[in-house]
Amino acid sequence: MEGFTTKKQQFATVWKMHTAGDAQWYPAKVPGTVYTDLLRNGQMEDPFWKDNEYRALDLMEKDYEYETVFEGTEAQEGERQWLRFEGLDTICDIYLNEEKIGNTYNMHRTWEFDVTGKVKAGENILRVYFHSPLEYIKEAYEKQPTHGSEDAMDGFVHIRKAHCMFGWDWGAHLPDAGIFRPVYLLTMTEGRIDSVYIRQEHEEGKVTLHFDVSRNPKEDLRKEIPVGKEADGYTYEVTVTAPDGTKIIAKDTPEDLVIEQPKLWWPNGVGEQPLYEVNVTLAKDGQPVDRWTRKIGLRTMTMDIHPDEWGESFAHQVNGKDIFAMGADYIPEDHLLGRVTPETTRKLLEQCKAANFNAVRVWGGGYYPEDWFYDLCDELGLMVWQDFMFACAVYDLTPDFEANIREEFIDNVKRLRHHASLGLWCGNNEMEMFVKQGEWVTKPSEVRDYLFMYERVIPEILKKYDPETFYWPASPSSGGCFDDPSDPNRGDVHYWDVWHGNKPFSDYRNYYFRYASEFGFQSFPSFETIKTFTDDPADWNIFSYVMEKHQRNAGANGKILNYLQQTFRYPTEFITLLYASQMLQAEAIKYGVEHFRRNRGRCMGAIYWQLNDCWPVASWASVDYEGRWKALHYYAKRFFAPVMVSCEEQNWMTAEANMNREHFVYEKSIRLNVTNETLEDKKVLVKWALRNADASVVKAEEREVTVPALSSVWLDKEEYPDVDVFGQYVSYEAWEGDTCISEGSVIFSYPKYFHYLDPQLSYRIEGDEIVVSAKAYAKGVEILNLSEDLILSDNYFDMSAGEKRVKILGKASRKVEDPADWENQIKEQLADGLKLRSVYDIR
């Protein structure tokens, strides 16, 4: 930084890498990883292609070295120099000019090494030696066989590395390595800013910011010294820049600063996301030393937990308002971390906002995302449920392990605590529940260590470094101490009876969870995504060797077929089966989410598993690895709409009737509900109609409804005892003025028995719109271009006979492209034609 005594030099230099012991070196990219460098240099095949995963896994039996040469200057009198590594994955030895300066053993930490007197004037050689993670966990497991998820490799619990790199029930065995974040040389004469902690005090018409600024002396970058507490010559100045550019400047080491008429930050769909830039400048005797710059949002955020008529509430409370959380669980974006960039993350999170998310849960089996992830969540209004990086395992809490994870916690809490989007810290994924059940536990000390880690160590760290952010000991949990972690009437729940338990979709309605932080259903990715890992038609069968290698949940393909036979007719073509699986997934999650939202106030969170994939695979994701939206993501856009009409129908499906056992009588009715997740009362016109399969109206009704802010309203039940369950359906809509803001349809039999007529789907293009026409009721209308990568304003929708207009919004892709390029591609592909189908075509 110009004019500051603390200098920061990034090693954006030329790097090279090789397999340790080999004479041949190859150009390397830092930040990056071993796999991405080997791919770039033609030294490995695509690990995602067919079963190449295993050849890629073998490469991690070896050690690797990275090396760069940089121009340095010797430390002057009074200066100290430090090497800073923001991300090393994972077991490394570091050498400067052939002298070992340190080693690392945690990818979740920042590592800094004192190199004062070791940097020469002129050329310096920096070398990083990566030890095989496979050899490391093998040796550690042989010494201490501590256990965890059976989907991962034995010993993964012994290394502070993203657990899912060793395999998961959606992930491959690809434990990549490398320098995945920047490397810097720090030169300082007076130390630096360690951290700035900003607490907010909200009152009517103003917000007071309270500042706790600490510094590190140049001799010890782990030592924290409060600024302004002693007469040592250190002072700081604060500048706050409002969204409109107005500046507030506070000099002379202010402990607080008042912002009048603040613009508050709200989650997406509830309000705006104005951000204030905060600059803190540290000086010594008037000489600028260092600067800290971040963006913050002005808001209060905690969890509202209090006894109520159903048990105990559990809701995000933002600016005093309880908000229903709507979103999905986020996993690492790519098995190859070198492919994750600010641009790829932006594309993914913008797709969350496009689908009306207001929250994401960062799952604990990966790694703490980059700063840009949280910056984007701040910008887009996505509340973050942040797991600490522990999942589905037990740990042996040795003194060394405890010291290691304490530093990990401090690093990440300091790094992330200022973010407006940070909704809560959570201790781990699914460990309280499984440890209580005795899963993976082989000795009593593992239970003791669990309690110590998540109910003592982490709370101690947070009490010191981030007391303002809510802490939850595990997910799921009812509050800790193994007190019924999956209690449906308290805390959060992971519900898997639909899917893992093979229960029908209707089972969701047996529960009124306070907050569902995991529930899911699998589907296959798009056909064009499948072709990225196999182009052989012999593989295009869900039980082929290659397709099962890209399905990591045991028995899941058969499970999809089991649910398929319950719901739809059997498809005779592979591509139709892919479509049917996505419709199953979308219908399953819709069944749950709409039920949870109808019971707003009792249930206050629906976070489905999962948002994304880290490689091309059959999974629970709503956006596949290539960025293509599955049917579920379009459904999410509708069932997470700020104002939504939904239907609680009683039909053959809810009765779970067995038509071959006996004559049965079951209720045929609907009860509509409108839920409003905005800060304004909404006046809507609700319309519904009983229709024949050709979409002709048998009986139509409408009702004007006022839905108070942040609430849901039920309409009266409508019974249809004489409905033709095989040939009639109900359509329903919510209108605000002249705009239909939400709609849907229900039938009274299983879809496989309903007598769908051929809707004779057709389309025409008008500017940036696709106009779809149907001559009968059509369920799940899918619009595809040849490369299956259009992003539309709506897709996989139900429609009665007539027309529906759909806007072309963009192109789905993991790659960052010039908008002009994809616009031209879309025009070319539209000229080649579109493919339309519906549930009628599942046959």
Residue ranges and their predicted role:
Residues 1-359, 489, 598-599, 628, ...:
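Secreted/periplasmic carbohydrate-active enzymes, especially glycoside hydrolases
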Residues 9, 17-23, 29, 33, ...:
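Substrate-binding clefts and catalytic carboxylate motifs of secreted carbohydrate-active enzymes
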Residues 107, 169-172, 266-267, 329-341, ...:
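The substrate-binding groove and active-site-proximal loops of carbohydrate-active enzymes
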Residues 323, 355-360, 378-383, 418-424, ...:
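Loop/turn elements at helix/coil->beta-strand transitions in domains of secreted/extracellular proteins
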Residues 326-328, 360-362, 384-386, 515-517, ...:
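Hydrophobic faces of well-ordered beta-strands that scaffold small-molecule active sites
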Residues 351-352, 377, 416, 596:
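Generic structural signal for hydrophobic
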Residues 359-403, 485-502:
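Aromatic-lined substrate-binding rim segments of carbohydrate-active enzymes
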Residues 397-480:
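Active-site neighborhood of glycoside hydrolase catalytic domains
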